[in-house]
């Protein structure tokens, strides 16, 4: 059984800050854990917009704090996010994630992340080996 506390991850290599300065991802489960998915406690900073397009991964997200919205690209459809909202990017959906308040999101990725990933110029994570 794996048991981790968020406090044990903060300030370690598993506490990743995006180069864009718009998010932080506390990576609770990673590829090396052998679960077949990775699990993240993610903060999106207020007043930010992040372009995301996970071409290599599927992601499910559950909001536990804050408010924001997703804008689907290219349709422009807006989807509000608030506590209790779940969305799943089951079609590798390109989107803009905006936080009007600090968002705290629980995110699951398949295939799992190794922990070293950051978004590329298209907003995607590469698929990395251990």
UniProtKB/Swiss-Prot annotation:
Keyword Mitochondrion appears in the UniProt entry: no
One of the record's GO molecular function terms: ectoine synthase activity
This protein's record includes keyword Lyase: yes
SUPFAM superfamilies, per the entry: RmlC-like cupins
Catalysed reaction, written as an equation: (2S)-4-acetamido-2-aminobutanoate = L-ectoine + H2O
Role summary: Catalyzes the circularization of gamma-N-acetyl-alpha,gamma-diaminobutyric acid (ADABA) to ectoine (1,4,5,6-tetrahydro-2-methyl-4-pyrimidine carboxylic acid), which is an excellent osmoprotectant.
Record's keyword terms, sorted: Lyase
UniProt-recorded name of the protein: L-ectoine synthase
Record-linked InterPro entries: Ectoine_synth, RmlC-like_jellyroll, RmlC_Cupin_sf
Gene: ectC
EC number per UniProt: 4.2.1.108
Residues annotated as transmembrane: none
Gene3D superfamilies: Jelly Rolls (2.60.120.10)
Gene Ontology terms describing biological process: ectoine biosynthetic process
Pathway named in the protein's UniProt entry: Amine and polyamine biosynthesis; ectoine biosynthesis; L-ectoine from L-aspartate 4-semialdehyde: step 3/3
Enzyme class, UniProt record, top EC level: lyase
